[in-house]
Amino acid sequence: VVFGREIIEVATFRGHHPNQDEEAKDNLSKQSDHGQLLRDNVFGSIEEDAERRDFTVNAMYYNIADFSIHDFAKGMQAIEKREISMIGDPATRYREDPVRMLRAVRFAVKLGMKISPDTANPMYELAPLMANIPSARLFEEVLKLLLSGQGLETYKLLNEFNLFEQLFPQLGPLLKTQNSRELAFIEQVLMNTDNRINSDMKVTPAFIFAALLWYPLEERCQQHMVEGGLNHFDAFNLALSDVLHRQIQRIMIPKRFTITVREIWQLQQRLPKRYGRRAFQMLEHPKFRAAYDFLLIRGQIEGGELLTLAQWWTDFQNVDPEERQGMLQVLREKEGGGAPKRRSRYRGKKKAAQ
């Protein structure tokens, strides 16, 4: 409702579904073969609305007339027990809207509660129902889950219920390997993101998506090189498009973010190339900072040459222009003279004038 210059959100009481004859007549509600609600414009009383809520802690109403709280589903008791409990049969409610599984996880982490056993148990079996949710809706849900300032704990709980691989199917095989560099990388990125959010620093969803899909990208690149006989440059760019295309089938990442994801990935290939003016040009790139932060985490997890490269870029940013030239000179000497010189074009000997 528009009230002056403000927009006030108004919630409508929802009622129970009518029988089949009424449904066909009024076309107010509709369910899929999986039991998912496709249309739900059934209006009702406050008591019916309370029964339609997902969790008991969500079925409380504040009356501004007498400042009282109407608790229809023992929500206060659930708060005291620090427990997220479903209203009604959990399996049926999850089938009606599988996103409720994500909401259960999000509320549990956000409120510091546990999910009751009756509410949690069906999630293991019903997690694949997430495939029936529109990809555009899942994008918004993922932002709520991972950009809440508690993304790491949310990820761990999603993974416990096999929900994370439903959101990122290409990560499925990697999530089953304990103590791997892939899992360490994901957890470090989420930890860093949580720290930035909790410090009121700017974050972009593109960085999260770039990190979550980095190792599927590397794996796909290797497949193209081995099976297709492509060089690394062509294989990498083909894999880049493949991985993003597959992910967008599940989560509709807007183009403004996929462009940044591509740039972060592509700059990982350019950061090792520091000869001539390339290092200075790299500093001026709009996405250098994001790509540099990405490289730092890769180096922290994988070590070796990546860690050395990340440290070089850290030092290069912190010294004055004269010292930067010195760093490049040392690099050229260390690499045996630097990048190969451009070959002059052979023109052949001039013929003598006759």
Description of each model-found segment:
Residues 1-354:
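Catalytic cores of the polymerase beta-like nucleotidyltransferase superfamily
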